[in-house]
Amino acid sequence: SEHGNWGMDYRDAVSCENFINEWVEAVERDFNHPAIIGWCPFNETWDYKGRRQYDALIKTVYEYTKEFDHTRPCIDTSGNFHVVTDIYDVHDYRGEFDEFRKSYERLVTHGELYEHVLNDNPGRQKYGGEPVFMSEYGGIKWESDKQYKSWGYGNDVKTEEELLERYKGLTDAIIDNERMLGFCYTQLYDVEQEQNGLYTYD
């Protein structure tokens, strides 16, 4: 279960208070739900509009979550910057699957993770040998209807077949990597400003 917090101002005491109350309520409410396989209180808490990620808050919320539910793994903040986490998750939207595959080969051969957030921020993002989860990938630009403005990563595909080929290449690269524990493709459906799904709302 990932909680909505993107763009939250960590300098605002009211925002923090509201977030913590909502998170505690969600964990206590959903603890016994069989669909919950893990917890993730934050998403992409990189430095935003000059606001540095608030590591102390992330660590505190992680520790509360683990104290309340020690039976499930907890990802502290999805994508970055990890502070303390049970699973090291990655967001990678590179569209060329050969490059995508090669960048994770050292995970199998040497137990080392080579991913852009870690490499661009070695002092802030650290890999400690945790299981690796590709929690966001894809985002392939696909314009099924030219009257709507599409958005996505990589060179846009022209046909459904081309989109499926790229999807398969990226997904196979993850499945074939024995050190990846799972994946979540984003996304199969158009959502709001991200008009790059294979399917539309209707």
What are these regions (language model features)?
Residues 1-97, 125-129, 141:
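Active-site mouth of glycoside hydrolases
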Residues 35-39, 63, 84, 101-202:
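Substrate-binding clefts and catalytic carboxylate motifs of secreted carbohydrate-active enzymes
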